[in-house]
Amino acid sequence: MLPKNYDPNEIEPKWQKFWLDEKIYKYELDEKKPSYAIDTPPPFTSGTLHLGHVLSHTWIDIIARYKRMTGYNVLFPQGFDNHGLPTELKVEKEFGISKDQPEKFLQKCIEWTWQAIEAMRNQFIRIGYSADWDLEYHTMDDWYKAAVQKSLIEFYKKGMLYQAEHPVYWCPRCRTSLAKAEVGYVEEDGFLYYIKLPLADGSGHVPIATTRPELMPACVAVFVHPEDERYKHVVGKKVKLPIFEREVPVLADEDVDPSFGTGAVYNCTYGDEQDVVWQKRYNLPVIIAINEDGTMNENAGPYAGLKTEEARKKIAEDLEKMGLLYKKEKIRHRVLRHTERSSCMAPIELLPKKQWFIKVKDFTDEIVKVAEQINWYPPDMFLRLKDWAESMDWDWVISRQRVFGTPIPFWVCDNGEIILPNEEDLPVDPRFEKPPRKCSDGSEPKPVTDVLDCWVDSSITPLIITKWHEAIKGDEEGKKWFEHNFPTALRPQGTDIIRTWAFYTIFRTWVLTGEKPWHDILINGMVAGPDGRKMSKSYGNVVAPDEVIPKYGADALRLWTALAPPGEDHPFKWETVDYNYRFLQKVWNIYRFAERHLENFDPASAPEELEPLDRWILSRLHRLIKFATEEMEKYRFNLLTRELITFVWHEVADDYIEMIKYRLYGDDEESKLKAKAALYELLYNVMLLLAPFVPHITEELYQNLFRERIGAKSVHLLEWPKYSEARIDEEAEKLGELAREIVGAMRRYKNSHGLSLNAKLKHVAIYTTDSYEVLKTIEKDIAGTMNIEKLEIIKGEPELEERIIEIKPNFKTVGPRYGKLVPKITAYLKENAEEVAKALKESGKIEFEVDGQKVELTKDDIVLRKAVFSEGEEVETAVVGDAVILFF
């Protein structure tokens, strides 16, 4: 029996343990069953899940549960992305271990990461996540690193991997290069400096505007727009840089924005991506003025050794003294920062460095073509990837100057020769292992000490989960697994990593297999705080899952995620979770009520012919099943979730169950059996529809109400409800809707008179013309539901008479004005009630004389109460469509 109260903290852990112990979600390769492989996002092992993880991974879980119910063999692994700067920073800060002790440092990174994995896995389980944990993977596992290194060797063999000096995004705080996807612009307050640069021929100045005066020592040109009339006369001339006494050319290029600042900018190597484009486009020299640690170098002359911020201030002061800085304007502008990890957020420099690159810029058209073969949900998310591909200025820098990461598996000779490892030795770590052979000239190759960008690790996840790495070795089981599951069915992920995880996965998978990685990609938005702003500690609006679940349970939180629209940001609202919790309480109470009535019910005894309201609710149910299936196939959970809640709370609980209670408690055994049959079919299917969304409460309901009859070990091993056209009954639906409206009007009458819903009504008559036959069909349902002693359904229109039953002055307004005349005014109103009412209706006032004195009263001065009478009895009325309800 279901306990009296719904307690998610009691039932949820119980069923989570049951699912794990019974291996309910274990995947077994079965070539006879259709496969549905999910390329799940491996979260970075920070040690805790945030609400963004809860949203995205609950979506994934909803899909996995639904697909199992529709007959698919669901491959649902979960991985963890282990490598990354935050772990290194934590080990340095919390454990005091330096990267100068690489082996000890690595060991501590691994130890800490295992602790983080354990904590995050437990959080996944606590939200009801139905992954097969036997398939869990970690990017720091040796077999995983071996697969990554094998993929890298394949790229090298295809001529797509190279080492070169090139401007890269450099984090002075982390002392490492970054991929474009790891950096981003942040809106900040700053200054725009207006500087006059003297023309070398002495004929005047070119005014430029810049936010970074400290880059002047690295200036190699000044650019203006070719159509800008202000500067046409200086194009081709040179300006002389103040302080540094160098001459640089003035060039024209259409990329210049004439409306920004003065319309003239200087090109420094390198202030931003545009500087890189111009330097390469015009083959300009490269001058570097900033060190790796963010200080100025010897090219900065007298400013060498200063931090960039200090040099900016000092150069601006010196230019002002020279009369060349003529304006300093406060602005709101975008600053490039290390945005991928909030623990850093340092300003980014563009520095030329020798790094390892994967060729990608030349393949963007192919990447877009492959992406077009994938079904994007929502479709406009494809455009984000396309725009990103078209905006790429250079290749993918994959090397990182870190310790904890997948090693780049190469040794390099002085002559440029690259020594590859023996593939049977993978994974290798050149930092600690000797090369497999010497250079061709007999010299010792030098190890590559860099590690890989973590996106190199995670961009082969669809290959990892389908055992590509085993299949290419000729492993028979691996080949079967790969052939059956690749391309995977689905990639679910967030909008924020379209340009990284989605882009690089499509690219790498296409290069390695010639195929798309997935058939579908589902994009979720970001989670905003309760105030609608991005969740941030600085805003004080961060809500952790561990704050929500103890109070409301995982199922209520899961419903909040299901209400998120695809591709759009979704604010966390406490009131939404509270509403969801109350909905689940309502569900609990529905099934507790039904449990008593269905205890000895045998579904095999269900009669074929049901009563009208039974046919109505089952018709509505099957319309919902059809809609639910369509929405689930399109991954549109938000609309479906709203429909489910509305249907269960209102049509099932408020209407249908209330309208069959009299039958369940009554003496008509045949009618009672029909009600039980409909209730059983209804609640069984509602449970199945809810199961992917709220797996814990539905498991509890199944085990208590249905398992003995059905036999399956878990609700999540049952089939998704099948839509039946035979159950659609349009006439019954019209009838049911009319019953809802009639009963609703009667409930409102009871409520307005302070009557309980089960209070008896002595006499009610319903007059109707068009709905007479329908109402006669449900006459006993209306009478039984509303406890009406005498209910009449009468064809035709009622004869109603409106009478004034009370008319008197409003003593508060009339008394002060007319004093002793009030009694006579009262008498006049009663004697002339109809005339007074007519005058008030037409003009809003009435004038008459009392004892020779003129009296003028408005609507506010008169209390007028009318009543409706039918056959001499006072009645109250309500109108529903063409039906008029009379309450005697």
UniProtKB/Swiss-Prot annotation:
InterPro entries the record matches: aa-tRNA-synth_I_CS, aa-tRNA-synth_Ia, Anticodon_Ia_Val, M/V/L/I-tRNA-synth_anticd-bd, Rossmann-like_a/b/a_fold, tRNAsynth_Ia_anticodon-bd, Val/Leu/Ile-tRNA-synth_edit, Valine-tRNA_ligase_type_2
CDD domains (alphabetical): Anticodon_Ia_Val, ValRS_core
Catalytic activity: tRNA(Val) + L-valine + ATP = L-valyl-tRNA(Val) + AMP + diphosphate
UniProt KW Protein biosynthesis keyword: yes
Keywords: Aminoacyl-tRNA synthetase, ATP-binding, Cytoplasm, Ligase, Nucleotide-binding, Protein biosynthesis
Keyword Phosphoprotein: no
Enzyme Commission designation: 6.1.1.9
A molecular function GO annotation: aminoacyl-tRNA deacylase activity
GO cellular component terms, A-Z: cytosol
Enzyme class, spelled out: ligase
GO BP: valyl-tRNA aminoacylation
Motif ('KMSKS' region): 534-538
Binding locations of ATP: 537
Motif 'HIGH' region: positions: 43-53
Record localization: Cytoplasm
Family label: Belongs to the class-I aminoacyl-tRNA synthetase family. ValS type 2 subfamily.
Function text: Catalyzes the attachment of valine to tRNA(Val). As ValRS can inadvertently accommodate and process structurally similar amino acids such as threonine, to avoid such errors, it has a 'posttransfer' editing activity that hydrolyzes mischarged Thr-tRNA(Val) in a tRNA-dependent manner.
Alphabetical list of NCBIfam families matching this protein: PRK13208.1, valS
PANTHER family hit by this protein: VALINE--TRNA LIGASE, CHLOROPLASTIC_MITOCHONDRIAL 2, VALYL-TRNA SYNTHETASES
Domain comment, as recorded: ValRS has two distinct active sites: one for aminoacylation and one for editing. The misactivated threonine is translocated from the active site to the editing site.
Name recorded for this polypeptide: Valine--tRNA ligase
Organism: Thermococcus kodakarensis (strain ATCC BAA-918 / JCM 12380 / KOD1) (Pyrococcus kodakaraensis (strain KOD1))
